[in-house]
Amino acid sequence: MAATQELLLQLQKDNRDGRQRKQELEKLMRGLEAESESLNQRLQDLSERERSLLRRRSQAAQPLQGEAREAARERAERVRRRLEEAERHKEYLEQHSRQLQEQWEELSSQLFYYGGELQSQKSTEQQLAAQLVTLQNELELAETKCALQEEKLQQDALQTAEAWAIFQEQTVVLQEVQVKVMEAAEELDAWQSGRELCDGQLRGVQYSTESLMEEMARADRETRLFGGPRALAIRRCVLGALQVLLTLPLLFLGLSLLWTVLLDPGAVSAWLWSLTSETTLRRLRYTLSPLLELRANGLLPT
């Protein structure tokens, strides 16, 4: 754009110089026209004088006698010399007139050339101005697109930051739930141990009871153990924790994958490849170890 403006300024300067040169040539042409008119008038005067001298010569050519003839001869000689001088002056004026005509033709051709060059400069200047306007419009459009893309990226970054904050909050909640689940599992283990001890004492006291009554008592204990309000609440808590454990990693994985695809699509394959590394598998075992402990404690189905 700077080169275009510089070229436009140079063309404007050349245009001003051409106009100034044109004015100078027009002024010189007016002077030459005035001088040519003056020379033509002088040439006409000399021609008139020549005709007058010729008439006087013809009149003086009549037969004279004595001194009158001699005087007439002298006057005729002077007239002849003057005619020769007038003829030479006429030739000089004609030559000068031809030179002026040649100069006039040269000036006319220069004026035509500069006039055409000025028209060409004006056309080029108009084209450059149109190109400059087009470039300015394209620049404004590109700046608008860049601003929109920047605003979109800022919104995406803000959404990602909000999702990350929500994920961290849910992670803290998940850790608290996991601690509570472990505590509940320990309480359930202790409660089951106490019930088993009580059941053993009861079986020692009622050893002589009929087998049918023993089966009914065992079924009743199992119903109270696994169908009571406390066991149902613990089971619901465990299931809710499992749902949170399964939902949060998937949510974080989806957000990370979406952000990575937006920034660098080529990094997705490298990221998927890193999921199968030994470090990732070790972290997965460490994350799933509490679930294995819950299954060992009888809180998860086998």
Swiss-Prot record:
Location, primary (coarse class)? membrane
**How does the protein's chain sit in the membrane according to the entry?**
Single-pass membrane protein
Q: Which residues cross the membrane?
A: 238-258
List cellular component terms (GO).
membrane
| Alphabetic keyword roster | Coiled coil, Membrane, Transmembrane, Transmembrane helix
Superkingdom is Eukaryota
Give a Pfam family name: TMCO5
Protein localization: Membrane
Disulfide partners: none
By sequence similarity, the record places it as follows: Belongs to the TMEM191 family.
Q: What is this protein called?
A: Transmembrane protein 191C
Query: Taxonomically, what lineage is the organism?
Result: Eukaryota, Metazoa, Chordata, Craniata, Vertebrata
